[in-house]
Amino acid sequence: MHCYAPDLYCHNIADVPFASLAKKNIVNICLDVDNTLAKRGSLLIDYQTVKALDKARQNGHIKNICIVSNIIWGRSREERVRKIAEQLAIEHYFAARFWERKPNAKPFLEAMRLMDSQPENTAIIGDQIFTDVVGGKRLGLFTILVRPLGEDHWTTRLTWRRHREIRILKHLGFE
């Protein structure tokens, strides 16, 4: 399969079929923060997202969740990741610094270590092909791409990543 092609493409986290994933023994979930769980820079998480994650956990479709975010630098950004994890009652999170950011292996390997999971039973849910999907594919994770919740970081706009992603999604038949 193409390294840019997500295994699943959903509108948002609430649309992810956690029951179907659990039937395939994919019960450990890595979650991106910016524009996946919350709009960039925000602490507000959509009610439908909270409800979907809670329901999946209560039904046993999710065993573990680890938030994996590229914070690049800054204590305030790491604090935001911690607060979001607390809101969702998520025990594990990894705030990747500049030199270890996604799509590098370290954030995913650390998340799997924290969840005591393996690639074959772990998924990554994120809004970017070049970080979340490519990084997950490199390690053999099940990759789920969701539409971004809000505006991109200036570096994403500067490098035209989102424009390239749209072209890739159209080429793959997702858009």
Give the residues covered by each predicted segment:
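Active-site residues of response regulator receiver
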Residues: D32
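Asp-based, Mg2+/Mn2+-dependent phosphohydrolase catalytic module
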Residues: H2-I29, A38, L43, T49-E175
